[in-house]
């Protein structure tokens, strides 16, 4: 019998090796299913094969987009009347992950010397859901932008209305829509950027009310979830169902812009609206 050249490692040795591998070193794209190393993917966090943009926190998005930024209404958070322990745990987890008090970051700043109001919904905070304070922050953003005669850019990323807050959450759809209307009646520009995912009550209201509606490549955009639709119509939708490319083909959005080009495209659109070349 030949002597063994290789020795089977012990479980203890394997555990030590696993512990030395950093978290997030390898990712798998949910769109094209490519597996890749993440050593060079910051700050844009794109799939190298298909260009799908992995989810960003609101602050990461601000750093990619804005040259200057001043946050507003940072203190607004979930009202005290919602005392459910499981819900409070989700909110606490969202605060830990994002550093925010709610699922949207709002403020004012500049993009390539163009002044604008900006809001960024954060999918890492209770799935970017539309809660009472979320709606209040976005409403204040639009009203403050109207008073200052500034455009609004809103990045949407949301699972929809926050069911834990019931009718108060649903009311935010109408409340924000009214603020959008006041801003529009003042002749001001509203640009929406649909990020992955934009669904539910957010899609059914202010996400589709922009003067210009952009989307990131392969972003999930829809109202009801795929599983709910399959159970309702008893059919299997196509693989690209509710992806930004399909939504563009059906005329619901104006353009798909890759993440590396998005900042310059927004700056160009702001200039065009001001009548600058």
UniProtKB/Swiss-Prot annotation:
Acetyl-CoA carboxylase is a heterohexamer composed of biotin carboxyl carrier protein (AccB), biotin carboxylase (AccC) and two subunits each of ACCase subunit alpha (AccA) and ACCase subunit beta (AccD). The keyword Zinc-finger applies. Zn(2+) binds at residues 29, 32, 47, 50. Its cofactor is Zn(2+). Component of the acetyl coenzyme A carboxylase (ACC) complex. Biotin carboxylase (BC) catalyzes the carboxylation of biotin on its carrier protein (BCCP) and then the CO(2) group is transferred by the transcarboxylase to acetyl-CoA to form malonyl-CoA. GO terms for cellular component: acetyl-CoA carboxylase complex. Keywords: ATP-binding, Cytoplasm, Fatty acid biosynthesis, Fatty acid metabolism, Lipid biosynthesis, Lipid metabolism, Metal-binding, Nucleotide-binding, Transferase, Zinc, Zinc-finger. Gene3D superfamilies: 2-enoyl-CoA Hydratase, Chain A, domain 1. This is Acetyl-coenzyme A carboxylase carboxyl transferase subunit beta. Pathway: Lipid metabolism; malonyl-CoA biosynthesis; malonyl-CoA from acetyl-CoA: step 1/1. A zinc finger (C4-type) spans 29-50. Pfam families: Carboxyl_trans (PF01039). InterPro entries: AcCoA_carboxyl_beta, Acetyl_CoA_COase_Trfase_b_su, ClpP/crotonase-like_dom_sf, COA_CT_N. Its EC number is 2.1.3.15. One of its GO terms (biological process) is malonyl-CoA biosynthetic process. The keyword Hydrolase does not apply. It catalyses: N(6)-carboxybiotinyl-L-lysyl-[protein] + acetyl-CoA = N(6)-biotinyl-L-lysyl-[protein] + malonyl-CoA.
């Amino acid at each position: 019998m030949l002597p063994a050249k290789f020795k089977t490692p012990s479980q203890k040795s394997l555990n030590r090796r696993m512990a030395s591998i950093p978290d997030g070193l390898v990712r798998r794209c949910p769109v094209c299913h490519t597996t890749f190393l993440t050593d060079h993917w910051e700050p844009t966090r794109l799939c190298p094969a298909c260009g799908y943009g992995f989810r960003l926190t609101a602050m990461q998005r601000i750093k990619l987009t804005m040259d200057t930024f001043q946050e507003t209404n940072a203190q607004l958070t979930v009202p005290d009347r919602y005392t459910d322990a499981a819900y409070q745990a989700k909110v606490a987890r969202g605060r830990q992950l994002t550093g925010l008090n709610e699922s949207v970051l709002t403020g004012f700043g500049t993009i390539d010397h163009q002044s604008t109001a900006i809001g960024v919904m954060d999918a890492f905070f209770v799935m970017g859901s539309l809660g009472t304070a979320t709606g209040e922050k976005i409403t204040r953003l639009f009203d403050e932008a109207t008073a200052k005669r500034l455009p609004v850019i809103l990045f949407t990323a949301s699972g929809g209305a926050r069911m834990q807050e019931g009718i108060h959450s649903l009311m935010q759809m109408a409340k924000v829509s009214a603020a959008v209307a006041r801003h529009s009646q003042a002749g001001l520009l509203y640009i929406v950027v649909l990020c992955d995912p934009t669904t539910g009550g957010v899609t059914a209201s202010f996400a589709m009310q922009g003067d210009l509606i952009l989307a990131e490549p392969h972003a999930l955009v829809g109202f009801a979830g795929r599983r709910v639709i399959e159970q309702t119509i008893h059919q299997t939708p196509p693989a690209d169902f509710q992806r930004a490319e399909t939504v563009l083909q059906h005329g619901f959005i104006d353009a798909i812009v890759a993440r590396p080009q998005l900042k310059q495209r927004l700056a160009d659109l702001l200039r065009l609206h001001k009548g600058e070349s």
